[in-house]
Amino acid sequence: MASSLHKHLLSAARYHLKETKRMSMMVALNLAAEILAVDCGLKPCFLYDYTTSGVQQICSYLKELQNLGLIVGHLHILNIEETILIINVTKAVSYLETLLHSQDLHLIDVSNYLSQPELVSSNQVPQIHAQLAELLGHIKPYQSGQPASVSVGGIQSPEWNLCTMFGFFLQFPSTYWFDTQKGFENCLSFTPLRLFTVQANCSRIGHQSVQIYSFTVPECVYQATQVHLEDWSKSLKQAFNEQNYFTDLEIITNTVSLPSVAL
């Protein structure tokens, strides 16, 4: 049964998505599992980075997953500056509304003029709230989408820090921010980073060790964010217990230091 489903998933990915004739079975299963993690509410969003496929090709692929009976909820495809996000609108709206009413956004300033990362000052919060409100205004109308359906939208040239907005969309517990008016480089080079990897087995399609989240927190601000990280982990475990697509949740941490970090 699993073998037959695996072949269907590989065939669907190769047929619908651009430049994927050589896509391996492992990649096809990872892709399907990441989308299922959004559908079942483990995370609000998935940033599509598997191929150079366009919105319509991804939409066609999602509809194929629905035809296979794998996707049961409404998913929204959002194109922001040629970056494609696959969104669980209900979960995303709920999370972004929570952020909009919070004065502590757990943002980490990694602007290149800093000697090391630090927490963002409160005077940046109103500007970021304004961007969150604009983002909410775009996706909220799609909340009424029918189950097992796909909608499509786009935002052109937003004057946002996209690194920060994507971090919010992906529901990272701490999100990076930098002053875009002073450049797009960061101060994370050779900075000790605590790497968090969340993985689980996707029993829905019989696939092991699916990465659900991967993010870093600089060691120099870890203590200041530790309580929030623990709360985030508890919330994730609660969401995990409320679904039946995935089993055997693991949260793995280690420390890395890299010569350069792309955001």
Curated annotation (Swiss-Prot):
Q: Which domain of life is it from?
A: Eukaryota
One Pfam family in the UniProt entry: DUF4504
Q: Which InterPro entries match?
A: DUF4504
Per the record, the similarity remark reads:
Belongs to the UPF0739 family.
Name of the protein in question: UPF0739 protein C1orf74 homolog
